[in-house]
């Protein structure tokens, strides 16, 4: 049975507290408030909490007339994630030329074709659950729990996609001098500490820090990254395809889901690594 989860329109039963912990759901039909799925992803994603944008993208098509016959074709409108930096003025002495400044705008294209399908640089990610009828019947809110697991998985995958792109860019070692030279304010900096724990320590106030920057732990990389995460984003295609199959005559079931994600990092110069 094929289906689609609309990340922009569908709602998720609120089985979680603000920290993402599942609440105990009583048997029966509990009256719960609903939570938009895009908000749930933002709440779970570590890179989003560090400042990155999570873009739930629905391909926008534009009607374009052709020739004089009135025929219309649908054309996909290219979208971008853009960052821009301050373009300071410089003192120019009499008789001197103005120095050419670096172009202050950088952008990365979102790679979706006219049919909303994936193109180059957009990764396709899948997951699959298998369970029997006994499992299905033994949980009072089985479908809701599966939905929450998928949404949390999208958040984790978004983290892994963006952090993988940052690590692949081989950032320079972090120093406060480098951050100052890049025009990054202290309040913009956030750190994510990977499984190697490089540079991580807990200060006297119980706050995890890496190279002095407030940090959080992530299982999705080994390195430690410090940077201005507001200059990065992850695109998640708004439609997540879900297929439910019966895998045996005993009624065993499988749920398969497919999602398209793309890291968007126009400028990697505002990210650094922390050594061990």
What are these regions (language model features)?
Residues 38-43, 202-276:
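Sequence/fold signature of self-assembling virion shell proteins
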Residues 6-9, 16-122:
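Assembly/oligomerization interface modules of large self-assembling protein complexes
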Residues 1-3:
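A generic N-terminal leader/anchor concept
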Residues 100-174, 251-261:
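Long, contiguous amphipathic alpha-helices that act as assembly "spine/axial" helices in icosahedral shell
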Residues 85, 196-198, 259-261:
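A broadly conserved detector of short glycine/acidic/proline-rich loop/turn motifs that flank catalytic sites
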Residues 179-219:
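Extended amphipathic alpha-helical segments with heptad-repeat/coiled-coil character used for oligomerization
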